[in-house]
Amino acid sequence: LHRIVPYGVPANYLTVVSIIIMWTAFTYFVTIEEVNSEAVLVAIFAILLYVIFDHFDGLQAKASQTSSPLGEILDHYSDVFNGAIVVYLCFRCMHLQLGWLFLIVLWFNFLAFAVTYVEQRERRELYFGKIGSLEGVILILLVMLSCLSFAGLDVWHQPGLFSQPNYLLLFTVFLLGFLFTAYGC
């Protein structure tokens, strides 16, 4: 599928396009008060495009042999900011407050990115666990798909384990994933 990208297109252009897509979705969500099913679809579509372009930029850099230190930094930093936007969009689509839980998940997300960046820069190796960031994004997309209906959204707010809302279990799984990533480095 990545072969549809013309060979002469620099990989950094693809990274910039993914940044523009995610920041456009973020700006849209900041300006709306109520998140409806159309807004959830916007978030899902933006994240899907981000994942595709993020994958394609690496393939394009290898295919065209245009990989550069600037491109690597641009890619890493776009992943950090876009990852934070993914967390924000997930919280908004789930109709959750941007309070303490949001800040904790965001902090652990940044921690996982920082640890993997240091690992790559200092030790010249990169650890990929059995469940990585792509699987986490796929899980977020599945959660967002469930938020398209009121019944699906309601599932996350229903009491579950220890009479706590089910979304707490979901974000506990995410936090454990971030910790395993950091520990694996």
Walk through the language-model features, giving the residues of each.
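Topogenic membrane-insertion module of multi-pass membrane proteins
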Residues: 1-55, 177-185
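A feature for the membrane-embedded catalytic helix bundles of lipid/isoprenoid biosynthetic enzymes
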Residues: 1-5, 78-185
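Membrane-helix interfacial "entry" motifs
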Residues: 7-11, 35, 68, 72, ...
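Hydrophobic alpha-helical segments of membrane proteins, primarily the transmembrane helices
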Residues: 9-19, 41-48, 66-76, 103-107, ...
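Structural signal for hydrophobic/aromatic residues that build the beta-strand cores
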Residues: 10, 58-61, 132
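Active-site-proximal flexible loops/turns
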Residues: 17, 25, 29, 61-64, ...
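Short, flexible/disordered secondary-structure transition segments
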Residues: 31-35, 60-63, 88, 153-156
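Acidic (Asp/Glu-rich) catalytic motifs at the cytosolic membrane interface
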Residues: 39-91, 115-122, 183
